[in-house]
Amino acid sequence: MKIVGGALLLFAFLPPVPAGALEKPNVLFIAVDDLANALACYGDPVAKTPHLDRLAASGVRFDRAYNQIPLCNPARASLMTGLRPDQIKVYDLDRHFREEVPDVVTLPQRFMAAGYFTARVGKIYHYDVPAGIGTEGLDDPASWELTVNPKGRDTADEALIFNAEPHRKISAALSWLAADGTDEEQTDGMIATEAIRLMREKKDEPFFLGVGFFRPHTPFVAPKKYFDLYPIESMRLPYAPGDDREDIPTAAFAHNNPVPNYSLPEPVLLEAMQAYHACVSFVDAQVGRLLDALDELGLAEKTIVVFWSDHGYHLGEHGGIWQKRTLFEEAARTPLLVRVPGATGNGRACPRVVELVDLYPTLTEAAGLGVAEGLAGASFMNLLANPGAPRESHAITQILRPADDRLAVPVMGCSIRTERWRYTEWAEGAAGVELYDHRGDPKEFVNRALHPTAEDEAAIALLRPLLRAKASGVVPTSAFDPARL
């Protein structure tokens, strides 16, 4: 028994294997970077993602999955520890969760303790991109028995990358390259190759294999054939009413994107959209290689497959928001596909609200391991059996803003999402409040908190205490780097 970040972590062993679970199944844990719900299986009208569509058709597609903080390092640290950002005190791109919770047992550690071989290929914990490619990044050595860090020709081709915002590094700017060469020469192609090699080598023992792809994080680099899938004339910027920004608090807009569309002309923005979609299709192809390998190695029927992104991504919504770091649906919502062999819910979509912190207890239950109490999330194993089953749940997402020329002091934003509502507070309301009714406003165009009806006020009264119970709107006293938020 131990106290972790204010939470009691206690491992209790289940006597039986849960219904629908396998005995010591493998886990193929696939992560992607900065992926919006820009997949055909999620209804994207232009996306070409046949392999992820195949996974969705054979598993459960979660339509309301949410991350805990839409920024790479803290989002990944939260998922892997099963704890919220306020518990691990990670809000920026540099702080390691073990500074706050040195003895926390991560998800792969839990499998390692149960006799699994645990390995990572590519980006599971945080890496700076592209500078960290080929390194260990901000990894957690205790989580893995083996790590593999491929470095492909995309790093050698950096001088060829077009940067639409030359005043910023390609890691942060809208930047892209339609690359020469094959998939296998790119870092993400090499990651797939190495993951397949490990699956072949370890096919006769249980494994937890983390496979982390770097795209579609900027710079958007993929072989040219994927760009060819998306003619510029098929690209469209998202619609927003002309007055959309008038009811949105200043703090709601990310500090790295204060100007709509970075003041870039529409033709350049359409090229950026083309490049983003090209990277999504490129990653889709690499996932297809992994799925094919499971079939070829006879592992598909004894391997749980999880596909997740660290957070969502903006592609010009709300009159020109790009990238992440907001509490709007586009950044807070995360694509999540889960396939447990034999689960009766496979092939269906789940409309219930789940969080990325729910993955830790779900996977340990699905594998028949001990249940770790004191985690922030709750298992959604029952939804894998029946995706439409009732679930009393809500999702919490937060983001920390630095002081800048718009905000006199740092501001914490916290948001709660139910199946119907999104309620957001900035500095506990002192810097703004938002309420969106997804029943009639799925794009979050109308902030009902400014002119609330009696029904809106009742919703706020219900949601506010639920939100504040799980996320503090007070700026943390723990260390954070304002330049790395």
Where are the model-predicted features located?
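Functionally engaged cysteine thiol sites
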Residues: C72, K470-G473
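Formylglycine-dependent sulfatase
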Residues: G20-A427, A431-V433, P442-P465, A479-A483
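Bacterial N-terminal signal peptides
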Residues: G5-P16
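Intrinsic disorder/low-complexity segments in short proteins, especially the signal peptide
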Residues: F13-L14, A389, S472
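Intrinsically disordered, low-complexity repeat segments enriched in small/polar residues
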Residues: G5-G6, R84, G473
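Charged/polar positions within long, soluble alpha-helices
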Residues: D292, S472-V475
